[in-house]
Amino acid sequence: MVNKNINDIPPILCCSNIIKRYQYSNFSITVLDGITMSIEYNKIIAIIGASGSGKSTLLHIMGGLDKPTSGDVFLEGRALNKLSDKDCSIMRNTSIGFIYQFHHLLPDFSVLENIAMPLLIKGLKFAIAKHKAQFILELIGLNNLCDRYPCELSGGESQRVAVARAIINNPPLVLADEPTGNLDESNSNNVFKLLEKINLWYGTTFVIATHDLSLAKKCHKIYIVSNGMLKISTI
């Protein structure tokens, strides 16, 4: 058996000449203008840029939540933007986790039920989903929050629960849009440390859109989005 060199392993995510243009009645706005990039497995990547620079739009296109005007997005070799809505939805639920600035936890469900929700959507029985959710909570040190509801959590606790929900399906890729943007410095550090642990334990790839330069500097690589263009930061 021939051992593959790490350089022979294809990237988990590729964006090829991504253009995103919004067309209005008598004018158009180009938000992304020819973005090409590759994301390696097992990395934590930051995408930084000013508000309105297009970093969130890029993240949504990477996750199949939006389609580019032209260009392609490949996730583990499959062109996301060429999939049917149904197939894209299935791939998102099995291969991609999402974390947002606001946790979007369902208020009428407990922490355990919120974390188990992606598994229930996937069709797993509640007993199995509950067991896996309990395991994740114990793994990240939040098992004491199991029966609480979102209204009973602090901001930092809510966001760590959102992280747990994002990894419950063990996706190879997690996309995080300003995951610490609503938190103070202490809670921001705690959330990022959790992402680092998950990256180390599971080899999960994280792509984080953020305006927090101190957070970005902790990542393996930083990309800058400016005027619709992308470049690698040397910060």
From Swiss-Prot:
Q: Which Gene3D superfamilies match?
A: P-loop containing nucleotide triphosphate hydrolases
Q: Which Pfam families does its entry note?
A: ABC_tran (PF00005)
**Where does the record place it?**
Cell inner membrane
Residues in ABC transporter domain copies: 13-235
Keyword annotations for this protein?
ATP-binding, Cell inner membrane, Cell membrane, Membrane, Nucleotide-binding, Translocase, Transport
Which InterPro entries does the protein's record reference? Answer: AAA+_ATPase (IPR003593), ABC_transporter-like_ATP-bd (IPR003439), ABC_transporter-like_CS (IPR017871), MacB-like_ATP-bd (IPR017911), P-loop_NTPase (IPR027417)
EC id: 7.6.2.-
How does the entry describe its membrane topology? Peripheral membrane protein
Molecular functions (GO terms): ATP binding; ATP hydrolysis activity
CDD domains in the cross-refs: ABC_MJ0796_LolCDE_FtsE
Task: Note whether Cytoplasm occurs among the keywords.
Answer: no
The UniProt entry's GO CC annotations, sorted and at most eight, read: plasma membrane
Q: Which residues bind ATP?
A: G49, A50, S51, G52, S53, G54, K55, S56
Q: Name the top EC class.
A: translocase
Recorded family membership: Belongs to the ABC transporter superfamily. Lipoprotein translocase (TC 3.A.1.125) family.
Description of how the protein assembles with itself and partners: The complex is composed of two ATP-binding proteins (LolD) and two transmembrane proteins (LolC and LolE).
Full protein name: Lipoprotein-releasing system ATP-binding protein LolD
Q: Which organism is it from?
A: Blochmanniella floridana
Upper taxonomic classification of the species? Bacteria, Pseudomonadati, Pseudomonadota, Gammaproteobacteria, Enterobacterales
